[in-house]
């Protein structure tokens, strides 16, 4: 019980107060946030159970556009350890890079998004994928590492879906 209370207070309650978020943002009580003052959640975004969203310790941000959908157990981390030989990984400086996720993106269960990645508006990333490089708007991606495997189809008689750039610009503005 003590461990649960510690997790909840350290990774959720204290950090939620620091979040930058739009209206109608929802997330499960088991979501873990770190360095939340550098996390930006666009209006209408939902984050599923067990997800982890960590901005960097000093500079890097995590920015989610409006109406993003994160399934359970998504991990987004905007920093990573260095890997220089001869120094234990724990002793190496962290490498921090912003993560920008456009509006209307859907990340399936157990997706991992690594530091420095931009995911374009309306993209869909399949369950279990590891996103290590940028993905274009309206793509469907999957795999380890994630790669584009298709594009979202247009509704009958319509053009492919797009999300207005203004919605993304609002999410990116600090």
Predicted features along the sequence, with ranges:
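Terminal amphipathic alpha-helical/low-complexity segments used for targeting or macromolecular assembly
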Residues: 1-17, 22-23, 67, 80-84, ...
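Flexible, glycine/small-residue-enriched loop-and-beta-strand segment within the central core
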Residues: 9, 32-41, 46-117, 144, ...
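Extended beta-solenoid/beta-helix repeat architectures
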Residues: 25-26, 57, 118-120, 135
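Short-chain dehydrogenase/reductase
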Residues: 46, 106, 124, 130, ...
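Glycine-centered loop/turn positions within well-structured domains
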Residues: 60, 137-139, 147
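Conserved acidic donor-binding loop of glycosyltransferase catalytic domains
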Residues: 77-78, 126, 132-133, 149-151
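Beta-rich strand-turn-strand
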Residues: 109-124, 129-133
């Amino acid at each position: 019980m003590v461990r649960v209370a510690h997790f909840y207070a350290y990774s959720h309650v204290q950090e939620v107060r620091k979040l930058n978020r739009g209206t109608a943002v929802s997330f499960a009580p088991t979501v873990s946030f770190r360095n939340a003052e550098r996390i930006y959640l666009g209006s209408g975004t939902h984050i599923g159970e067990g997800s982890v969203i960590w901005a960097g310790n000093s500079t890097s941000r995590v920015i989610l556009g409006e109406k993003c959908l994160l399934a359970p157990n998504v991990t987004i981390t905007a920093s990573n350890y260095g890997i220089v030989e001869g120094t234990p990984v724990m002793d190496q400086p962290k490498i921090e890079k912003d993560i920008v996720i456009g509006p209307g993106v859907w990340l399936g269960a157990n997706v991992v998004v690594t530091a420095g990645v931009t995911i374009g508006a309306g993209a869909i990333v399949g369950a279990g994928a590891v996103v290590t490089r940028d993905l274009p708007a309206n793509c469907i991606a999957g795999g380890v590492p994630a790669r584009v495997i298709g594009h979202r189809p247009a509704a009958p008689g319509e053009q492919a879906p797009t999300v207005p750039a203004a919605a993304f610009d609002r999410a990116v503005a600090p």
